[in-house]
Amino acid sequence: MDMGELVAIDVHTHAEVSSKGHSSLDDDLHDASSAYFKVEGKRKPTLEETAAYYRERKMAAVIFTVDAESATGTEPVPNEEVAEAAAANADVLIPFASIDPFRGRAGVKQARRLVEEYGVKGFKFHPNIQGFFPNDRAVAYDLYEVIEETGTIALFHTGQTGIGAGVPGGGGIRLKYSNPLHVDDVAADFPHLKIILAHPSFPWQDEALAVATHKPGVHIDLSGWSPKYFPPQLVQYANTLLKDKVLFGSDYPVLTPDRWLADFEKLPIKDEVKPKILKENAARLLGLT
């Protein structure tokens, strides 16, 4: 991966469909999220299509599935397939994995194998969909131990989710699990764990900013929202106290980097801060520099 050639690193993209056409979520949840985000373009690009999309734009992308099989009954896109696609497109794709925390010891073993054999750089958790509190010691802490030990990254969805939005009962998805203060406990208990709080954390934006300011290992990605809707305090912190800890993320394919970047250019972000957010902070966190 040539850092000099890349204009940006998108730290938040999804592998929505496997090579066999299997989706990571059922159709109702996919359709609801498409309506919520007003998706432009193809909703379920293949891994190869995603690589080509980012290569055309001279961007790199962190890519992952979401394993929430215990809660949803739907198998995820295989982590191994995501990692293999990233290896085949190593100029643009960076593999993360996702492991249902309710897999227990089998999940812990799988996490270690994915790092050692497949070169996975981090793990995505979606507490809303997976149905767990990030600070539940009995459920997730053994996984965090492996992630901290291997020097990889734990990326947590925070705040409201478009998944299930508008579906009766929200599709059974509960928002309470994704308050970033639950991740504050994780950061305190695993002081060397590298953490990303994904998204502007509505309705807990101030909590996310407090956690990222207080805990050295905690970063924030800006995915899932058009920048024109960012809360003003998020923009203020990105320009100042958190200028080295805020990361560009789109949430592709539900939100394209083209749309995100066009709106980002309209924000009052300092010229010296823009390259940090778009590439430099992510490159350092991912160990690419």
What spans do the regions from the language model cover?
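Short aromatic-enriched loop/helix-cap "lid" or pocket-rim segments at secondary-structure transitions
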Residues: 19-25, 75-76, 108-109, 166-169, ...
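Short, flexible/disordered intra-domain loops and linkers
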Residues: 25-28, 38-39, 71-74, 164-177
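Mid-to-C-terminal alpha-helical segments outside catalytic/metal-binding sites
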Residues: 1-14, 18-56, 60, 112, ...
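Active-site gating/metal-coordination segments in enzymes
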Residues: 60, 68-165, 228
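Conserved, mostly hydrophobic/aromatic
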Residues: 12, 82, 95, 123, ...
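Catalytic metal-binding/acid-base residues of hydrolase active sites
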Residues: 14-16, 100, 128, 159-161, ...
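Catalytic pocket-lining loop regions of alpha/beta-barrel enzymes
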Residues: 121-122, 134-247
